[in-house]
């Protein structure tokens, strides 16, 4: 039987492939893809603070009690993906964007250390961080709102407004520029903060404000968090970074809800920070959904 020339070529090609398979030789169908190299920076919300309360430890990246971090968090979960390889986690509880006398490494100092260690460089594909909350005196605003029993929470409003004013001065562009100077090819993802307190009218609210502050103050504080996130988002995007909103992932799980994902209790240093559930069910899915790390992998 005669084959047309095209069929003869196809038959010959099939025979050649079959011979290779039967001989035991192997040829990869696709070039292997290396995972995206990933560095984490930031404050306590980047450092897993509260995920294993009351446990905390010195961050081995610094080896100093000036830089503490908590337990496994969204960063560790991201590192478990085949598409991601964490080369360094430099986040420190209490870190700020601006200069400080606390001794806690600032975000810029974290980036510099990561670069010195060889973790942050031109091959880095992803950098994540949360920062800005300590620059606006997060703890002081909570204290002011908790102490405010006025019907309209006027003292809390003043404290929150001052916090937004401070947020406008946070040097997000300078921070992104510093990171970009070490890792020119990296995607930089600036993560936001969740709303902390359940408010009146939510279906999961057990007590508005969680017993920490009045319902009026809780509403003011949460609005202030939204405003902080909006400022950070605008600044991050203007600087060429991505802003990752996490607030919606925590809806129904604030302090005072029937299923809170926040620490509040005797281990006061971890109060107002996410639990393990907060990091794994709040921050982590928000990160994966927004960043899409598999798309950053290069062959």
What are these regions (language model features)?
Residues 26-39, 104-128, 172-187, 288, ...:
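Short amphipathic alpha-helices and their capping/turn segments at secondary-structure boundaries
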Residues 74-86, 170-188, 224-245:
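A structural motif corresponding to the C-terminal end of an alpha-helix
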Residues 194-299:
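Catalytic His-Asp segment of secreted/periplasmic serine-dependent ester chemistry enzymes
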Residues 37-49, 86-91, 125-130, 135-137, ...:
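Structural recognition of the beta-strand scaffold that forms the well-ordered cores
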Residues 49, 102-164, 195:
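Oxyanion-hole/transition-state-stabilizing segment in secreted/luminal serine hydrolases
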Residues 1-31:
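Secretory targeting and sorting signals
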Residues 52-66, 141-167, 202-218:
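A solvent-exposed, charged loop/short amphipathic helix patch at secondary-structure junctions
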